[in-house]
């Protein structure tokens, strides 16, 4: 698996940026890939000096296709219940963008208990959120005591 991940990384480094035909010439054309279909299209005919065309040979190995660079399968998580369905050895959690700060903190705490890696929040940011949660808890305790 690690060998295939390293191979995929090397292949991705070699892979050119596939841009739409004539995208450099007209501002109104975005760079998003569109297959050239014109009858006289030099790009479709794969002329040497024209930009490269998407081909199957640029594809990554099937075993690691679609995986996170760490080798874990990327699973979108909305709440703690979703998190408990994951296998920590093969899957990693990606917290959805619509999840708020309070629920995000709950998910981080539970993920640490279960040994699940969160893929879209760095360790530093997780620590920062947990410290913020502790600070808020201490503040709430002080308010209830007064």
UniProtKB/Swiss-Prot annotation:
One of its GO terms (biological process) is translation. GO terms for cellular component: cytosolic large ribosomal subunit. SUPFAM superfamilies: Ribosomal protein L32e. The keyword rRNA-binding does not apply. Keywords: Ribonucleoprotein, Ribosomal protein. Pfam families: Ribosomal_L32e. It comes from the Archaea. InterPro entries: Ribosomal_eL32, Ribosomal_eL32_arc, Ribosomal_eL32_CS, Ribosomal_eL32_sf. GO terms for molecular function: structural constituent of ribosome. Belongs to the eukaryotic ribosomal protein eL32 family. HAMAP family: Ribosomal_eL32. This is Large ribosomal subunit protein eL32. It comes from Methanocaldococcus jannaschii (strain ATCC 43067 / DSM 2661 / JAL-1 / JCM 10045 / NBRC 100440) (Methanococcus jannaschii).
């Amino acid at each position: 698996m690690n060998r295939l991940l390293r191979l995929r990384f090397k292949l991705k480094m070699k892979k050119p940026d596939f841009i739409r035909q004539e995208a450099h010439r007209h501002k109104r054309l975005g760079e998003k890939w569109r297959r050239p279909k014109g009858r006289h299209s030099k790009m479709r005919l794969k002329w040497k000096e024209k930009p490269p065309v998407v081909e199957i040979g640029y594809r990554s190995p099937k075993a690691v296709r679609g995986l996170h660079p760490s080798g874990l399968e990327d699973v979108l998580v909305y709440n703690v219940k979703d998190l408990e369905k994951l296998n920590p050895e093969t899957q990693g959690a990606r917290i959805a963008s619509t999840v708020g700060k309070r629920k995000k903190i709950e998910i981080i705490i539970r993920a640490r208990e279960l040994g699940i890696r969160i893929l879209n929040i760095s360790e530093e940011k997780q620590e920062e959120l947990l410290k913020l949660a502790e600070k808020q808890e201490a503040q709430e305790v002080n308010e209830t005591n007064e």
